Amino acid sequence: MKVPFSWLKELVDIDVTAQELEEKLFSCGFEVEELIPLDAGISKVVVGKIVEMEPQEGTHLTKCVVDCGSYGHDIRISTGASNMKLGDCVPAALDGSTLPGGIKIKARKMQGVESNGMLCSGEELGLNDDLFPGSEVYGLLILPEDSVPGTDIAPVVGLDDYIFDISITANRPDCQSVLGIAREVSAILGKPLHMPAMDYKAVCDADAPVSVKVEAPDLCPRYMAHYVRNIRMGESPRWMKRHLALCGLRSISNVVDITNHTLLEMGQPMHAFDLNKVAGRSITVRRAAEGEKITTLDEKEFTLNPNNLVICDAEKPVALAGIMGGANSGMDDATTSLLFECATFARDSVRKTSRALGQNSDSSARYEKGVDRHSPEMGLARALHLIQELDCGDITTLEYDLTDGRPLERRHIVTTPAKICGVLGITVPDQTMIDILERLEFTVDVQADGSWDVSAPLYREDVESFPDLAEEVIREYGYDHIVPTFLNTASVTNGGLNYDQKQQLKTKRLLAAQGFYEASTLAFYSNAEFDMLHIPADDEARKAIRILNPISENLSVMRTLLAPSMLNVIVDNLKKGNAEGRLFEMALVYLAKELPIQEHPHERQTLCLGAFGPAEDFFTVKGALEALAAGFDLTFTYQRETTSWLHPGISAAVYCNGKRLGVFGKLANEINAELEIAKEQKDSQNIYLGELDYEALMSCVEGGLRYKPLSPYAAVKRDLALVCDEAVACGDIEEAIKKASPLITEVKLFDIYRGANLGEGKKSMAFSLTLSDPAAEVSAEQVERTVKKVLGNLKFKLGIEIR
């Protein structure tokens, strides 16, 4: 939220610099994201008085002699402007000066005549008419006649100001206004707060009846309205235009500006209905009917439902409650009578409608954080005062104040100084705490028994109990008073990881050792992700739980697979120029027994692997899985399996102890062709994915450590190149080899070859066999017999020949 320093000074007698105030606000819990000087980028620009001027022969330029005070009384500057006259004061950017946007001004010749600077327009200084009148005139900015030559330009045109860009947390909706921040500044500096004037006087009766009613008090706890007739549209005064401009708004007309000014100053959103456009001169706050439509002030049409709160006339909706008015009831130059409204709407209702319709506004931003029930009264009073002050219309006696029946009263909290200090862990003098609370507009009534009856201001709905009071005390007293101390206990229990956390950490380290980096994605995506992976319509993975109020349609369902998220991460990396990489993610997937969901879904821990790059292949992921198996003393087996999102010939299912853990392989060609990446990337990239049920994997791990003595005898290795049919699976060959002899302790595939010399439908697979015996050295005869048995088994069971 943007808060001008000069506006704060109107409400509080500030005696510190903007930089000092920024530090004080931060120490009291307000993050100033940026302190913006209005004269940023401007240097060595001063008031210059034109003392001589003559046309520059043969050009459109005018040669001027400018009095710039202490910088020189006869500085010669040429300009292409024509709206100045002798004696005018104008902004002069001297040799070596800078202007907004990084523009540097240097002395140079213009059409053969030396010019020692530049005379500036308002726009060149970053000004507009709302900030300083005349800034948008084509030509030079003409300054007031009494401007002193040589004076820095910033204070002359109002650029000697700062904007505080403050991040307001959700628990402090009372600070969503200049007044809210001014209250805090008043308490911080111990200076009195000058409240904006809110007095007004009704000068006439209503010339026609107006009906106002609330049919949904649960969503609209308070609705206030006041009828103003004989509206006189016109320009706003300069001070109001400047206030709006400093906060980023343009002046429109006096009445519209009053509603915007009230929003910024008081934090109270308000709207004015043109009663000539309100059917039946009737206003009703109700839930929308199914299929009802409204076109808002920004000319967007929305179809509504009963979850949306609307303000209607006798025929149709005229505003989205708390968000934006309708185009069919807005003000224009022909407006003669207005109904000003201020209300409190349920924050959840505004937030859900705003998200569902994708419609946001300054009003909805405030209502979503919360507007207290006292705020409409103050906001409407301030607006009516301004209407009377600016003579915009005649205030009638017709007013409405409709509530949900709850009394409007201050919340009382009974506590003791000891309780507050107990929360803080330090001792703060009683009187100091009372002074702090009273500066923050709390009242403290000290009881006979020493307890305090503290009442919170009406606008502080966030203060509910004595820990909240402790927070108010310490942020004003200073967090630096809190001294770090050890816990008052005989022993301290060090934290640690439980078994599951240790296993997860071990898994991550094993994968990191294989060159994989951890990825972290959101737990939501859209149903379109299932289409991206060509997952069949009847697949269990499509039973995704839909979010009731998603941030966007792209994040509308809870994930049932990690693979779509991993593929999106890979595509994003490729788009950003990362041509290769290895990634893994360990996260939960959410599996519903039935839809719509009736009970809490099963949250299953899942592991996903992703590898991409021209050099990556099937064995990248398989090698990572083998490293994982070795790290947990497991043995994985692999079987051919078809999955919609993997290549049918370059993929496999992973098993351990007979349990299916998951699948891995190369991304299916048809999916790769549909990826939103460059064609050359599609042609050169190899993308591999794998997804495992991590819980099933961990169930195969035996608890405790087991030790096996190393064999004192050297192991023997033999390599076999085998020719088989394309249909023969690698896992079947490995299993047949291992069953041939107990001497075979390890089998590794290290090469696959296909060629015309092998014959059609044939492939060659090369395996490395490790033979060892812990009790004796393996002899050459044993090796020979084992190899013969292996080859015999392979030929008999799978029809495989040695190459």
Language-model features: locations:
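Phosphate-backbone binding interfaces of nucleic-acid-interacting proteins
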Residues: 1-202, 339, 358, 362, ...
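A carboxyl-terminal module marker
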Residues: 2, 20, 27, 438-442, ...
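Conserved mixed alpha/beta core segments that line enzyme active sites in large multi-domain catalysts
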Residues: 33, 47-78, 246, 259-328
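Beta-rich nucleic-acid/ligand-interaction surfaces
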Residues: 39-43, 200-203, 455, 491-492, ...
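Extended, well-folded interaction surfaces typified by the phenylalanyl-tRNA synthetase beta subunit core
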Residues: 180, 413-579, 718, 770-777, ...
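Terminal amphipathic helices with adjacent charged low-complexity linkers/tails
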Residues: 185, 189-214, 391-420
